Amino acid sequence: MVKRIELYQEAAKRMAISPDACMEQIRRCSISSKFGYEGTDPASLAAIVGMDADWGAAAFAELRSTGFIKTDWARFKWYQPSGKELDDKIAELAAIEVAAIIRLSSMDCAPALPSIRALAENLLEEADGGDTIATSLAHNRMMLAIVSATGELRLMEDYVKHASVAVAYAVADRLEAADLEGMKRSANVIVDLIGTTEPRDCAAEAVAMRLHPREPVNA
């Protein structure tokens, strides 16, 4: 239980816009393909934003841990998934989220509901603000709480493996205003139904938020 809680807390803390403006600039540029398919290293990172070697080393480690930099044989490269690769990743996340929602329908998850509702409220606020990255991160924080509420360490480990910060940014790069409105409607349904004995509609909205956010089930 302690390991699961620590895993959740660490993942949720990471799932946020960087407080370092230079780091945030690099995150956004990498996902929007402004760096192309070139390799990267600490020195080149520091050069991009005019920082020193220590900053470059720390930034390189942080970008690797959050999924923005991947290992490609003997070099490091930016995470720039193809459309299919991102579709597959989104489907994996949706499948785990559905499994968690179904599991919670047979549990007493009342202790987790205040936190889930607060995170849903945060998602609504971010969506109202129109920032797709902030909304995508808020979506992931809400879903992290839902998966964690099952109490299943293996499910949580699997989810954290797929739900990287870089994936949240890549998803955000696809989102438009209509998607944010749909996500708000789905989030409201999810918090109303999570933990009830009829999880089908709740699970369907979770899938909608991932696969077709502008078309919620209960539009």
Set out the residue ranges of the language-model regions.
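Short linear motifs at protein or domain termini
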Residues: 1-106, 217-219
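C-terminal all-alpha effector/ligand-binding and dimerization domain
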Residues: 171-219
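Short, hydrophobic secondary-structure boundary micro-motifs
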Residues: 38, 72, 135-136, 155-159, ...
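Mobile beta-alpha loop/short-helix "lid" or hinge segments that flank ligand
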Residues: 65-69, 162-164, 180
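All-alpha effector-binding/dimerization core of bacterial HTH-type transcriptional repressors
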Residues: 19-22, 29-30, 40, 79-145, ...
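Short acidic/histidine-centered micro-motifs embedded in hydrophobic/aromatic stretches
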Residues: 119, 161-165, 205-209
